[in-house]
Amino acid sequence: MEMNFPTFLILKKINISVCPKFTLKEVIQQTIFSISPNDSNKMMAGELFEVNENQLKVVSLDGHRISIRNVTLKDHYENTKVIVPGKTLSEISKILGGDNEKEVLIYFSANHILFEFDQTIVVSRLIEGEYFRINQMLSSDYETKVTINKKEFLDCIERATILIRENDKKPLILNVGDNTMELKLNSSFGSMNAELMIHKTGKDIMIGFNPKFLIDALRVIDDEEINIYMMNPKSPCFIKDEDATYIY
């Protein structure tokens, strides 16, 4: 089927990147959950797509949490930094197949992004403005590092959330010791207390988290074990792998 597009979209293509279909779908699914659910801040309603030579970085945040995925591309491309609406990415994720052999062509222009795959073309306006300074939010410092089985940790948190109403903000308390981590949650429906085996480097710590935020991140991580980095009870923690291909 012949498709006609506005001339300005064709003329203003200034850059192109190529990414496997499976990789793009995975990257979107692993970041889309932490965009802002409303449009109160337009930057938080989109995701940063940043190409630096052969590296693609995708970032989303909602004011409470941040998701970052770093992907190595096959070739080197012109450096580009744009903000793509989350609604566009959600729709693309739905129609992208899981084929890792086929590729998605991604065209960037000053005001638009164009995705081309499987005889399908998706064009979207970009969100105008400068994205947040992500590097200022990230720190490599930590006082405590916990390595834990991801499935056991996720299963335990999901059991705990049975005791919480949807809008209840009861924190999940993590009490980190030498070889174990205690998980505690109290609500009007009851209480939960569980203990998991861990490998710890650094100090003991007791810290509370929104269990939903942990669940959202853990569900999209494929690793069998995860590393959690913590500074103190009032600072954010980071879940990331050794190569920083993902950071939550």
Question: Which residues make up each language-model segment?
Answer:
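Structural preference for solvent-exposed beta-strand-turn elements
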Residues: 1-248
